[in-house]
Amino acid sequence: NVTFRNNTLNRIITRGLLLTIRGRAVVENNHFMSNSMSGILLSDDAKSWYESGACRDVLIKDNVFDYCGEVPILIKPENRVNGGCVHKNVRIIGNTFKKYSGEVMNIKCSENIEITDNIFEQSSEIKQTDCKNVVIK
């Protein structure tokens, strides 16, 4: 299990946080600011770097995403053909998304996703590909 809480990630030349863990992960009360890529990436890299696996229980709560160079929350396993959902049980709750005109989340091959009580200062676009049981409130 991992808890990542009360941090500021500012001007990182890659993604702010690469998260791949089968246990419980809590990402709470962080500020992702001016990172070159996504603020948070959930990957499942079985194609190139082989450095990560599927996530099974993730809470992303009360964070601020302030101008990330790419989509702030990217949930994207590196599969080319959908062979079923990879990431499961992801809750994205009470976050603030600033300065975005495009997608604020891009979610692929995932199930049991809850997106609730987030603040979108500009765009609230959420892209979903091959997902099951996604709830947006």
What are these regions (language model features)?
Residues 13-20, 36-43, 69-75, 99-107, ...:
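Short glycine/acidic-rich loop motifs that flank beta-strands on beta-rich extracellular proteins
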Residues 1-26, 34-36:
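Beta-propeller domains
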Residues 86, 99-101, 109-137:
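Extended beta-solenoid/beta-helix repeat architectures
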Residues 14, 46-51, 77-82:
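Short, recurring structural edge motifs at helix starts
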Residues 2-3, 21-26, 56-59, 88-89, ...:
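Short "repeat-start/strand-capping" segments in structured domains, especially the N-termini
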Residues 72, 86-91:
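Generic long, charged, amphipathic alpha-helical segments
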Residues 29-68, 122-137:
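Long amphipathic alpha-helical scaffold regions
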